[in-house]
Amino acid sequence: MTAQQGVPIKITNKEIAQEFLDKYDTFLFDCDGVLWLGSQALPYTLEILNLLKQLGKQLIFVTNNSTKSRLAYTKKFASFGIDVKEEQIFTSGYASAVYIRDFLKLQPGKDKVWVFGESGIGEELKLMGYESLGGADSRLDTPFDAAKSPFLVNGLDKDVSCVIAGLDTKVNYHRLAVTLQYLQKDSVHFVGTNVDSTFPQKGYTFPGAGSMIESLAFSSNRRPSYCGKPNQNMLNSIISAFNLDRSKCCMVGDRLNTDMKFGVEGGLGGTLLVLSGIETEERALKISHDYPRPKFYIDKLGDIYTLTNNEL
């Protein structure tokens, strides 16, 4: 069982909120469902992040969203008035690029990557010197015809050594069909950005990257190597990059099977589940073999600010 020991503590008053803040030096935040929902910042997001900075806490942002590059994320943070440096951000697209460089040892300038996903993946690959195909290429938007597809008429690109698959909001048969051709080659590695089956936005729940990657896995009869949360390669990279003490770190997220699992299996000192995204209080308290329980949970992140400042 992966469940964390002890009944999760709900942060409901100033004393518990202060105890929580005092326990940790570094906070790792998921973004979607925690800091914002789509293009809307959640209440008191800016205030709680500023409070943590004033307290001398280290802030790191760890998202399974591969559609944006780290640079694009700094701009999104800036649109909410939040100053975040690129090196503070780890996306699943960036983690996938690091994986093919450091683990698969693919060579920039020689090995190409076929991307099923959006621009964030291709941008991170480009920064590391890799040429990518597919992805946001507008020619993939056209209806599929095997006899006319520019990606098939002259045969597959023989230099493609890897497929990286992530969330693609333009998913269509053309993208699925060409990606499958590369996955049918045993010499081509299969990398998935993240396992999230869904994501919340504007009061709805939408299909996530995992639902699309698993479609490719089913049709190709292959299993991808996932790089985003809860994969520990991603956490190990973060711990190493910032020389962190795991016992003084807390993972803050809105999903039990990715964010909380990421923190618990990574041996972090704490986990905080926020209920502003995908999970419910009932699931947070339930003991399950499929996901761990958090150490703390709260209705929304901004409540820590209002509790500690008596503004409820």
Swiss-Prot record:
Catalytic activity of the protein: 4-nitrophenyl phosphate + H2O = 4-nitrophenol + phosphate + H(+)
One of the record's GO cellular component terms: nucleus
Activity modulation notes: Activity enhanced by Mg(2+) ion but inhibited by Ca(2+), Zn(2+) and Be(2+) ions. Inorganic phosphate and ATP are competitive inhibitors, whereas pyrophosphate and AMP have no effect.
Pfam families: Hydrolase_6, Hydrolase_like
Record keyword Hydrolase present: yes
Keyword list, A-Z: Hydrolase, Magnesium
InterPro entries hit by this protein: HAD-like_sf (IPR036412), HAD-SF_hydro_IIA (IPR006357), HAD_sf (IPR023214), PGP_euk (IPR006349)
Molecular function as annotated in GO: alkaline phosphatase activity; phosphatase activity; phosphoglycolate phosphatase activity; phosphoprotein phosphatase activity
Positions of disulphide bridges: none
E.C. designation(s): 3.1.3.41
GO BP annotation list: carbohydrate metabolic process
Subunit structure: Homodimer.
Note: Present with 2980 molecules/cell in log phase SD medium.
PANTHER family: 4-NITROPHENYLPHOSPHATASE-RELATED (PTHR19288), HALOACID DEHALOGENASE-LIKE HYDROLASE DOMAIN-CONTAINING PROTEIN 2 (PTHR19288:SF46)
General function of this protein: PHO13 is dispensable for vegetative growth and sporulation.
Protein name: 4-nitrophenylphosphatase
Gene: PHO13
